[in-house]
Amino acid sequence: MREYKIVVLGSGGVGKSALTVQFVQGIFVEKYDPTIEDSYRKQVEVDGQQCMLEILDTAGTEQFTAMRDLYMKNGQGFVLVYSITAQSTFNDLMDLRDQILRVKDTDEVPMILVGNKCDLEDERVVGKDQGQNLARQFGSAFLETSAKAKINVSEVFYDLVRQINRRYPESGRRQGQSNKQCCSCVIM
């Protein structure tokens, strides 16, 4: 079974942990408890293929910056999360993406831009069009999500698996060859 390393990145309080825990455990975490680093594993089926996702839920971008390069180096795919209720979290994404590209030393990195908390429409300050435009500029996918309302949560991770499969196709293996292959995704 192919493994995928996904890293979730973004500013503090945007809902990185809420998205990850909702996807992995089906639970919405109400209480904000800043993350240092948590790792989750979940087996899923994407397009008829069994996949093992290793998801690294990271600290907010303003914390533990020394560890971030290591996450980026090891990740195969990245979820860049902002809150639609906080403009500053959206503004942080450009630097975050630039750092990923610098560490990976390539412009072609599986990545999805995620506007979280779309259930809080009354508190929206970042328009959906802004997210779509930035994703277009990045050449990445874009989704608005709500961990609380379970909107587009699984789709984020499935889309990233598909991107990783396109970017790093599994070479045909003869019987008896090792089945171990690892791919990484980072969610910011």
UniProtKB/Swiss-Prot annotation:
Observed effect of gene inactivation: Worms are viable and fertile but display molting defect. Longitudinal ridges termed alae, which are cuticular structures secreted by lateral hypodermal seam cells, are poorly distinct or interrupted. Died as a 'bag of worms' after degeneration of the proximal gonad, or alternatively, as a result of a burst vulva.
Pfam families referenced in this protein's UniProt entry, alphabetically: Ras
InterPro entries xrefs: P-loop_NTPase, Rap1, Small_GTP-bd, Small_GTPase, Small_GTPase_Ras-type
Residues the record lists as binding GTP: 10-17, 57-61, 116-119
Transmembrane regions listed in the UniProt entry: none
Keywords recorded for this protein, A-Z: GTP-binding, Hydrolase, Nucleotide-binding
Xref: PROSITE patterns: RAS
One annotated Gene Ontology cellular component of this protein: plasma membrane
E.C. no: 3.6.5.2
Keyword hit for DNA-binding: no
Domain of life: Eukaryota
NCBIfam families: small_GTP
Name the record gives this protein: Ras-related protein Rap-1
Name of the gene encoding the protein in the UniProt record: rap-1
